[in-house]
């Protein structure tokens, strides 16, 4: 990526990075880093890890202050809707990450710049980059602008639920259900891993799902579990 493109992204984000290579790393998919080791740019998984934590802190703090009467369970549900892959995927297009994401040739040809997991992960990586380079206040300011109208209390109540949240709420209607997710399998090279996740209810494996990230695999597994439970009720 040339310097002009990186400056264009900085303008969209509203920040001049002290170390532009941090931003470059945030938009570098593992497949690209694997194909171009000569650039010496780290891929975005570590920044994604950092950004995930920063985003969760911001959303938790915001919801805690905005809804003083809501229970821990209700706050958790709202947070899940705000930070789920579907929500981050939508936000990625707001800052044109689909145009800036650096992908390996195979991943790009496979439509990787439109793939939910790639874009959702890149959003978290960008948040991590802003935090690491500019500090917590800058990161919180960026998240506020990124989410925009989504953070208005009246809009928060209308947020769509992801599959994991829907499954959790369904099981909570019946007492004593214990829900957990487990990564059952990791396949492929480091830059193109495929994960298989399992939905386990009361220590019983109910459904599995596959995806290019752990989150994506868990969402797919939850979706299949919901379909299975729905079919059982219709019988």
Swiss-Prot record:
Binding-site list for Mg(2+): 48, 121, 124
Function summary: Digests double-stranded RNA. Involved in the processing of primary rRNA transcript to yield the immediate precursors to the large and small rRNAs (23S and 16S). Processes some mRNAs, and tRNAs when they are encoded in the rRNA operon. Processes pre-crRNA and tracrRNA of type II CRISPR loci if present in the organism.
UniProt xrefs under HAMAP family: RNase_III (MF_00104)
Name of the protein this chain belongs to: Ribonuclease 3
Subunit structure: Homodimer.
Family matches, as SMART domains: DSRM (SM00358), RIBOc (SM00535)
Keywords: Cytoplasm, Endonuclease, Hydrolase, Magnesium, Metal-binding, mRNA processing, Nuclease, RNA-binding, rRNA processing, rRNA-binding, tRNA processing
Cellular component, GO annotation: cytoplasm
One Pfam family this sequence matches: Ribonucleas_3_3
Major subcellular site: cytoplasm
Species of origin: Carboxydothermus hydrogenoformans (strain ATCC BAA-161 / DSM 6008 / Z-2901)
The organism's place on the tree of life at top rank: Bacteria
Classification via PROSITE patterns: DS_RBD, RNASE_3_1, RNASE_3_2
PANTHER family: RIBONUCLEASE 3, RIBONUCLEASE III
Cofactor list: Mg(2+)
Residue ranges of every copy of the RNase III domain listed in the record: 6-135
InterPro entries registered for this protein in UniProt: dsRBD_dom, RNase_III, RNase_III_dom, RNase_III_sf
Similarity comment text for this entry: Belongs to the ribonuclease III family.
Gene name linked to the record: rnc
